[in-house]
Structures are given as structure tokens and as C-alpha cells.
Amino acid sequence: MHSLVMTVIGPDRPGLVEELSATVAAHHGNWLESRMSRLAGHFAGLLRVECPEEESTRLLEALQGLRDLSVSISREITTECERPRKISFEVVGNDRPGIVQELSSAIVRAGGNVEELVSDLESAPHAGHQVFRATGSVAVATDFDDAGLVTALEALGPDLAVSLEE
């Protein structure tokens, strides 16, 4: 079996996920995992599928031939797990340019690796402006200092509320 990781982006439309999944199934593929979202009128997806070796070329061609979609495909890279522990985080505060870069830099400096990140702007109740919210997961070593990560994230500004959960 070949394991493939792909990104898919294009104008959102009804039936798009069904079309993708039908294409995978038609080539005897197994949809293993995915993350999908609608952003600014576009469908954006990241997915991992397995298919028989003899079907992989035809599957790739079929996916790349889908209407109005840009598909980028890579073979799965298997690596040893160097960071066996995951920590979930949430950061909420005033939005500003560069906040995602600051957040990701603080996580790296503290010794973590961002594995998942979802960010959004939300209306702040009674404030009349938007607030930034990020949630995600960080892979860390077994002996990782959780308090050090909280300190690094809180140092980004007094307006940020930070929470971690194992």
C-alpha cells in the first residue's frame, strides 16, 4: 500500500468532499485522516490516504484532474517519534500583526513543536473589537516543562490568556 499526503484547494462548492472521497474510493483508496476548512470562499483540505501500489498513479491523475482544484501530493514520510507527549493549548488576546509568528516562536524557544494550529478572530463581548483566538497542539519531550511554555506565551503580552491541557 502507498500512503499519500495531499493538500487540496479551490473555490468551495457543494459536493466537493463527496467528489474527493468518491475519487479515492474508485481507486481502492482508504481515507485515513483529514483536516478541512472553508476560508475566504475557498475549500482547503489536508488529507492522508492509502491505496494499492498499482492504483497510485491513476489515483494521482484522477485527483489532479478534478475541476477547479489544485492538488499537491507527497508520499508519507515516516519518522521516529522524538516527542512522545502532546499538550493542547489555547491563547486568547487582542489581535495584532505578527501574533502567529510570536506565538510559534515562543513555542519553539520553549522546546515544543507545533503540530496543529487553528486561529480565528472573534467579536469581543462589550469591547467593540476583534480578539485573536488560537488553539492547537504542541509535541514535546517527556520531561518538558509545561510552566516554561506558559511563561513564554504569557510574556508575549499582558492581554493574552493562556491555557494548557494534557
Could you say what each language-model-derived stretch is?
Residues 1-166:
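A conserved regulatory-domain signal marking ACT and ACT-like small-molecule sensing domains
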